[in-house]
Design a protein with these regions (language model features):
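Long, basic/Gly/Ser/Thr-rich N-terminal segments
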Residues: 1-156
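Short acidic, glycine-rich loop/turn motifs
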Residues: 41-43, 166-172, 444
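ABC ATPase nucleotide-binding domain signature region
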Residues: 58, 66, 72, 91, ...
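Intrinsically disordered, low-complexity regions
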Residues: 73, 80, 145, 161-163, ...
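Extended helical coiled-coil dimerization/tether regions that scaffold
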Residues: 117-188, 238, 251-261, 276-366, ...
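Switch/communication elements of ASCE P-loop NTPase nucleotide-binding domains
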Residues: 173-225, 232-235, 347-481
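RecA-like P-loop NTPase motor core
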Residues: 288-338, 344-346, 410, 427-431, ...
Length: 519
């Protein structure tokens, strides 16, 4: 097996001796380290395999482009090491046979294949900052090592679920705390969605934002933040997420927005993601910021429509149209969608017609369709995906929210995904078993996680609102309103003002106030 490097500058070596692999130098920047290459494997003139991205680092490097041989080579020098982007990379090469993958991984000194290569770099800054930067890298090393020792390709099984323990803090002056999200399957209970609730200001969005950074490896402000785990860290075994999809339609979210330089923008344009990190939302980086500053703006309706069409195009390219229609079935049963002709919308291949239909939808319908389409477009399918959704109820009527939740769950089931939803909605809790609900509390500068006091699944909205969201009588104003009215008016006069008979609780309260007055 021979290797040649296609350099970004200067002359590049060539070879016509099969088999060989071409390593195309990328200009992606991992906080000063440029170690990314795209690999194409040529076994013959007709057998060509696009293998995707790999990282190659040197033990003695302090940054810049990885120094690579300027001539064809069969093995990298001692002190070099490589790692593929995901398990799919290793499975593709494994399927080509031992006579291919052994010289290939030996030649690139792959850390999943060669323990000595791993030992030579694992204490270096480049290993942590570049090689392990993106989500799932450590898990990929472990899984690939098992694969490459297996006598035959193991059968890929869908995950039975797992726990994710995450230690973080949500404000500079707050404590570090650990939250455990539980996705383990228990019988036929719906296990793929965890709900996160808490009062405004407790830090729910910040918690999800930190989790997105750590799970994906994208979004640290500086190299130092990455090295000191500024956003948090996983406790125990790292989760097996290949892709992280962030969904937020709040103008005030704190999620990291990709596209901070031209390299990132170009990659987003080509692939729709940055090494597995996907942001679906309202905010966009502004190009009008003064030098050295970063500001944001809200995306225009035309940009949102363009993103929807782009996601729909990716669904077609991935041949997932049928899966998308299955995912949309719960929405098709919602009365508000039955009037739209949703099936016709997605069956139409004329983007101008689709754009016109999308343009005429309500804001809630646009949000729902865009989210579900983007999830179907970007969710991995080959390895688990983490989906983080921040307060989806903002734009949605409760019945539409319930239908949306069913569609999200169907998408997660279809493609082996898992979601965490930060919410204030009792509708979402009504659809979620309490063992999959986490309550974030804050007192002064101390955060902690507690469990709901009741079983939330299938409970009435009123009980959930009172017992879980703590909306007691003291939190509402209707008592004061009725007390003021009852001091001057009879029950009959009050009901005449409303135009309908009051409910049991209101009538009882008015009568009790009238009794006090008459005494």
């Amino acid at each position: 097996m021979r290797f040649v490097v296609s350099f970004r500058e200067g002359e590049s070596p060539t070879t016509n001796r099969y088999p060989y692999a071409v390593l195309v130098q990328d200009n992606w920047d991992d906080y000063g380290y440029r170690s990314t290459f795209q690999v194409t494997l040529h076994l013959s003139s007709t057998e060509v395999f696009e293998l995707g991205n790999i990282k190659i680092i040197q033990a003695n490097s302090t940054g810049g482009y990885t120094e690579m041989p300027r001539r064809p080579f069969e093995q990298l020098p001692v002190g070099y090491a490589s790692l593929g982007a995901d398990l799919e990379y290793y499975e593709t090469i494994y399927k080509l046979g031992r006579e291919v993958f052994r010289p290939y991984f030996e030649g690139l000194r792959d850390v999943a294949f060669d323990d000595e290569a791993k030992a030579s770099v694992e204490d270096t800054e480049g290993y942590r900052v570049s090689m392990l930067r993106f989500g799932g890298a450590e898990r990929t090393i472990a899984d690939a090592a098992r694969l490459l020792r297996a006598p035959t390709l193991p059968t890929r099984r869908r995950s039975a679920g797992f726990r994710v323990k995450f230690k973080t803090r949500v404000a500079r002056d707050s404590n570090h705390f650990t939250v455990e999200f539980d996705f383990r399957r228990r019988g036929r209970l719906p296990n793929r969605i965890n709900a996160l609730i808490g009062y405004n200001g407790t830090g729910k969005t910040r918690l999800l934002s930190n989790l997105a950074i750590v799970a994906s490896g994208y979004g640290y402000s500086t190299k130092e933040d990455l090295l000191r785990n500024a956003a948090g860290r996983f406790v125990g075994t790292a989760p097996p997420f290949k892709t992280v999809v962030v969904v937020s339609y709040s103008a005030f979210d704190t999620f990291v927005i990709p596209g901070q330089n031209q390299v990132e923008k170009d990659r987003l344009q080509d692939e729709g993601e940055l090494f597995g990190y996907v942001y679906c939302g309202l905010r966009e980086r502004s190009d009008d910021a003064p030098d050295g500053e970063q500001t944001y703006r809200l995306r225009t309706p035309a940009e949102i429509q363009g993103e929807f069409l782009s996601a729909l195009s990716r669904v077609r390219e991935a041949d997932r149209q049928q899966e998308l229609l299955e995912v949309l079935k719960p929405l098709l049963r919602d009365p508000s969608f039955q009037r739209i002709g949703l099936t016709q919308l997605y069956a139409n291949h004329n983007d101008d017609d689709i754009a016109e239909l999308f343009h005429d939808l309500s804001s809630g319908h646009k949000v729902v369709l865009k989210i579900v389409t983007e999830l179907t477009a970007h969710i991995s399918g080959s390895e688990p995906t983490l989906v983080l959704i921040d307060e989806p109820e903002t734009h949605l009527h409760p019945p539409l929210l319930a239908a949306f939740l069913k569609s999200v769950r169907a998408c997660l089931e279809a493609f082996d995904g898992y979601a965490i939803i930060a919410t204030h909605s009792p509708v979402i809790l009504q659809e979620t078993p309490s063992k999959y609900v986490r309550v974030l509390r804050r007192a002064a500068d101390q955060n902690r996680i507690v469990a709901p006091s009741i079983e939330t699944f299938a409970e009435t909205i009123g009980v959930i609102t009172q017992e879980v969201f703590n909306l007691g009588d003291g939190s509402t104003d209707w008592h004061e309103t009725l007390k003021t009215l009852a001091r001057r008016n009879s029950l009959e006069e009050i009901e005449e003002m409303f135009g309908v008979r009051l409910g049991f609780a209101a009538r009882s309260y008015v009568l009790s106030i009238r009794d006090e007055i008459e005494e």
